[in-house]
Amino acid sequence: MIFGHGDDAYRYGEQITADFSSNIYFGADLTDLQAYLAERFGIVGHYPEPEAVSLEKMLAKKLGVPEDMIMVTNGATEAIYLIAQLYSGWASIIPQPTFTEYEDACRIYKHLLSYNADNNLEVLPEDRIYWLCNPNNPTGNVLNKHLIRHIVHENPRYLYVVDQSYEDYTLSPVIHPQDMTDCYNLMLVYSLSKKYCIPGLRLGYIFSSPIIIDRLRQIRQPWAVNAIAIEAGKYMLEKDPKMMPDLPGFLAEAQRLREQLSAIDGVMVMDTA
């Protein structure tokens, strides 16, 4: 999905007053990050790390997991497409409705697609990969983390891709990598772009078994993550949680908007988690 994702003000050449086409937190203050990157701008005169190892080390330490279970990517989208490429031609099941990049990536790499409208994790006929967005985009639904762990353990023949790009936008408990180091059929996808409200820098990562991480590294291009993005990621991790979204305020504003829209005749606002 190259066009149609949203947040495309560049196409219109004018200031956008209110942009509802993207799910990024709108109240981020990136002033300190901007000043830091200005000081570090000289790094663009050199190639970045072929793999963002320095950032991976910081992430692994912060998460309390082995370094060989983390791979930093050029946004969560690169992670999705790399996974689809690694398992090219496999069968995939994608619950509906959900983020369309899973289907787009699977189609490019010739997956046999099937759909699960009920989001029932127990339904796995002949499918080998189960793609799950949790919290789900666009519905906001959050599946119980204990249920996910149970299903992953009970079905070792299948692979599970759980996209947790929006984990910082919910109060519901979600899976933590430290609790899943024994799950060798699981890939967790994360978005630092959304976590720290920096979508223009494209920064994400995959948590999985060392074997899967190594295989993913073998098919990706070098220098996939640029030097500025790597520096921004390290800065954000050091300053966390100062750089995190104001979740209570964000959710309160979402509720206010929901109530205002619901008051309009002919407008039905669907509930979210």
Task: Tell me what each language-model feature is.
Residues 1-46:
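N-terminal "arm"/small-domain region of PLP-dependent enzymes with the aminotransferase-like
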Residues 48, 60-82:
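Short loop-beta-helix segment that forms the pyridoxal 5′-phosphate
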Residues 66-70, 164, 184-185:
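Short acidic capping loops at alpha-helix termini that bridge into adjacent secondary structure
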Residues 75-85, 162-171, 178-179:
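Glycine/small-residue-rich loop that forms an oxyanion/phosphate-binding "nest" at active or ligand-binding sites
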Residues 84-107, 119:
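Conserved PLP-anchoring active-site segment centered on the Schiff-base-forming lysine
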Residues 114-170:
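Active-site phosphate-binding strand-loop segment of PLP-dependent enzymes
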Residues 185-262, 266-269:
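PLP-dependent aminotransferase class I/II
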